[in-house]
Amino acid sequence: MFEFFLKKPKRVEKNWGYELIFANDEANNYCGKILHLYQGHKFSMHFHDIKCETFYILNGKVQVSLLDLTSKNGNISVHTLNAGDCLDLPRLQPHQVEAIEESDIIEASTFHRDEDSYRIWR
């Protein structure tokens, strides 16, 4: 017989809002979160050595800054994402998200490890 487990997501408070972690399975290498960002708040420019992420903008509007790793000058490209937009972030891609409006983002990724986040700047 198939077993299933009902559970509540884990809420993690952040300076920019909070995360609702509804899945983080190391054995099967996947993670699911909802990132809630308060208007005008952003998380640090950072990257992951192992983790790959896909963002789906559930509601609101965000600005995503991507650091160009091929540029010697550290060029940054800025992209506005609206509800319904998706963004794939490969491992090692520095990124920062700022909420233009209060926003919810569904994050689907490989397994999340706290020690796999490398901050470049706040």
What kind of feature is each model-predicted range?
Residues 44-46, 64-65, 88-89, 94-100, ...:
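Short beta-strand His + acidic residue motifs that chelate non-heme Fe in jelly-roll/DSBH
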Residues 34-35, 46-47, 52-57, 79, ...:
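His/acidic/aromatic-lined binding-pocket segments of jelly-roll/cupin-type domains
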Residues 68-92:
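Short acidic-glycine-tyrosine-enriched beta hairpin
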Residues 27-30, 38, 49-50:
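Short, surface-exposed loop/turn motifs at beta-strand boundaries within globular domains
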Residues 4-9, 14, 70-71, 94-122:
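Double-stranded beta-helix
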Residues 50-70:
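Glycine- and acidic-residue-biased ligand/ion/polar-headgroup-sensing regions
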Residues 40, 59, 102:
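ATP/adenylate-binding site constellation spanning eukaryotic-like Ser/Thr protein kinases
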Residues 1-33, 42-44, 75-79:
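A short, N-terminal "cap"/entry segment at the start of jelly-roll beta-barrel domains
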